[in-house]
């Protein structure tokens, strides 16, 4: 059973017991700030703040002191900046949960943000951005989202090397930190064996429960950083081919616009994704790898934001095999052919039944660790706010997936796999001819 509690300062707690027998607690603090809250003069700021929260507080003044405290209790700690939120993750033995809540609340609420540490950490963030710049899938993802979510706050990358052509403004990043890292924009999501009332006591004694003085100027910053949405009415396919001379392979992405985070269509799309690429014998892998020997790495992915979403076919391949494989079709025409077959013939009863059994089994395996359970609860609580609208992770299959019919999944295929909402992205050193790519994709019904 999921339980929640909200404090006078707006801080929220969402709690659930684990579905395994391990004496391990999974703790996420989810901060309601991401790259979507940034203005042009502070791009990359949310990610930079995530780094700075590890640089010490008055109580724990040095980075090494923070790390030693976590190391001393055998805790696993990590953090991630997303477009919509920032997460701080902890896995630890139940006996040390109080230590972790106390330390994490201090880190996030009371970072000293020393200018000297800021200047050192900027070099580290640049190194991280350089690593992403060498990652073809990351480049392709940024390109895709700049098109699919154009004119919205989701258009911009979380961080990229271009943001660091000039040095960050210390004052502006610090201002962003103080505006967004406040109790009313934080959620503690915990999955633990510890009783709910005991967790409440731990939060009460932490900095999460502290009342802070109102600051009108910071409130003004929040009001100016409202997330911008854009519902683009796409009426024809788009093609985006970019040369990246250091890549030995081509990275291909065929993306269709789909539904938003709150739509029930996402469950049908996720099941379809699983059927197409989430199993050993899934359609995409069998077609490209087993039957034609064309790719080692291919996948179908889905993603949803508050206003829109997408489903993408992805493949990494040798440049010479994108359009042709000798006398046979190459990767792109095979993907287009697969989509045409899905639209015309749909999926079979046996495929649907296998996909359901498989996704149910994999969701049960996920519950062996409580991390997914904790993250699921926290993100849903952030975006839905109403706990009655949150389906516990162990109930998602029975509630949303088990009852999906053949009629539903084939209807979703026809609803979203439309040529006019298709977007094709290709990056590599050796690129195909644009007109040939268009000619191939025009075969989509």
Task: Report residues per predicted region.
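Short, flexible loop segments at the rims of nucleotide/cofactor-binding pockets, characterized by
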Residues: 54-57, 162-167
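Active-site glycine-rich loop that binds ribose-phosphate moieties when present
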Residues: 166-174
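Short, polar/flexible loop-turn hinges at active-site or ligand-entry regions and domain interfaces
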Residues: 56-61, 109-116
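Acidic/histidine-enriched alpha-helical segments
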Residues: 68, 111-130, 195, 215-233, ...
């Amino acid at each position: 059973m999921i339980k929640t509690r909200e404090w006078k300062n707006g801080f929220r707690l969402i709690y659930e017991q684990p579905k395994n027998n391990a004496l391990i607690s999974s703790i996420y603090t989810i901060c309601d700030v991401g790259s979507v809250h940034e203005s042009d003069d502070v791009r990359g700021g949310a990610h930079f703040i995530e780094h700075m929260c590890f640089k010490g507080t008055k109580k724990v003044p040095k980075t090494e002191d923070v790390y030693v405290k976590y190391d001393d209790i055998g805790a696993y700690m990590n953090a991630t900046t997303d477009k919509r939120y920032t997460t701080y993750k902890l896995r630890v033995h139940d006996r040390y949960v109080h230590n972790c809540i106390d330390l994490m609340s201090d880190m996030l609420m009371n970072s000293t943000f020393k200018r000297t540490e800021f200047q050192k950490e900027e070099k580290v963030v640049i190194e991280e951005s350089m690593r992403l710049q060498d990652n073809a899938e990351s480049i392709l993802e940024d390109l895709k989202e700049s098109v699919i979510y154009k004119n919205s706050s989701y258009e911009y990358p979380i961080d990229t090397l271009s943001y660091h052509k000039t040095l960050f403004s210390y004052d502006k990043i610090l201002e962003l930190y103080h505006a967004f890292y406040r109790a009313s924009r934080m959620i503690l999501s915990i999955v633990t064996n510890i009783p709910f009332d005991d967790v409440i006591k731990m939060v009460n004694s932490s900095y999460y429960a502290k009342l802070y003085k109102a600051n009108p100027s910071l409130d003004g910053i929040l009001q100016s950083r409202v997330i911008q949405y854009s519902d683009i009415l796409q009426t024809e396919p788009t093609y985006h081919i970019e040369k990246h001379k250091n890549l030995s392979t081509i990275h291909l992405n065929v993306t269709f616009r789909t539904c938003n985070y709150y739509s029930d269509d996402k469950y049908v799309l996720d099941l379809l994704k699983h059927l197409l690429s989430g199993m050993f014998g899934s359609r995409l892998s069998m077609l490209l790898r087993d039957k034609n020997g064309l790719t080692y790495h291919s996948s179908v992915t889905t993603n949803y934001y508050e206003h829109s979403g997408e489903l993408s076919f992805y493949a990494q391949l040798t440049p010479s095999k994108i359009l042709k494989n000798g006398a046979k079709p190459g990767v792109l025409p095979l993907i287009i052919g697969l989509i045409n077959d899905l639209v015309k013939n749909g999926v079979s009863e046996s495929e649907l039944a296998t996909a359901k059994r498989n996704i149910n089994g994999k969701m049960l395996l996920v519950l062996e660790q409580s991390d997914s359970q904790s993250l699921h609860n926290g993100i849903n609580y952030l975006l839905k706010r109403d706990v009655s609208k949150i389906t516990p992770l162990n109930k998602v299959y029975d509630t949303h997936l088990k009852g999906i019919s053949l009629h539903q999944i084939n209807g979703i295929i026809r609803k979203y796999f439309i040529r006019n909402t298709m977007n094709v992205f290709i990056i590599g050193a050796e690129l195909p001819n644009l007109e040939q790519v268009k000619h191939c994709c025009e075969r989509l019904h």
